[in-house]
Amino acid sequence: MQRPLVTVLILATATLANGWLFVTKILPTLSPGTPPGYQAFYTTGSHPLPVAWTIMLNDRAVGSALSLAEQTDDGGLIVRSNLRLEHLPVDEIVPAWAQIFIGNVLAAHPAITLEAAGRMKIDRNGHLRQFQSLVQVPNTKQRVKLEGSISDNNKVVVSLEAGGIHYETDRHLPDNVSIGDELSPQATMPGLYPGRTWTVPIYSPLRPGHKPMEILHAKVEGQETLHFDDQLVTTDIVNYRSDFGDHHPPRSRMWVEPRGRVLKHEAVILGSKLQFVRCPDEVAETMSARLEGHDEQFVDFPPLDAPDRLPVQSSTPIAGTTKPASATVTE
């Protein structure tokens, strides 16, 4: 594989694969009895929650994603994830300016296939401590390696390696904000009602140093009926915008059913519509077999404190009586 194609891989990874693997939003403790922080994404009460998604790009299926949580002896979580993208059209996810520089490679490789694996370590207080992801082009030695850690004083250290390129940065993470981006699918969002609003500070250590943070404004606006698991389900629609007004289309949207499960997440990237459509719990249970031998891919990464064997997962429904994921809520 030519070196320019590695650049394509990095760009594609930045827009899609790491949007899934590079974690989502930090939650405050929602209410007594609710898992704290990041744990609220992956547990239902005391039960870990496997979640699977079908990935759609411009209304075409291009892959699937899976996450599976495992509780540790100290009350924390290890979350393993897998993402597969098949025949992904490069011209729909790479910026036009980048296509100018990789035109010949793009003509020879109009679509790429990627497989990504990820791990996260979350402590008993719901704080993210480590994240690792590895993106591989099947049948090649080309890969993208991303890893990071967050210390007790909120210092974030992130490193990225791909195609002989190495990038590393460390920054201070403000309290009660998100790390990653709003494009990552969120499994649960309980406690919604029409008109509810809140703000979500988005912080990414990979963004330019002069502007590492952005504020998004979320609002529950309207309802829509979706077909899910052979049933018609009425969902609340959550819109995310860069400002308070509704003069521009939302940057991303979520469809949330009454029990708090997110059934669909949609965002627009470079004019292309990216959707994560939730799979039924039974499908997620079946897909969890993809994580067998998952940790063997991370022999070059620092170890995570986790048991060697994955537990049997529960598909207990989510009860939604708590507040949505947010840093600031306006009642």
Q: What is each residue range found by the language model?
A:
Residues 2-154, 160-169, 191-331:
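Acidic, serine/threonine-rich low-complexity disordered tracts
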Residues 172-199:
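Beta-strand/loop-rich accessory regions of lumenal/periplasmic or secreted enzymes
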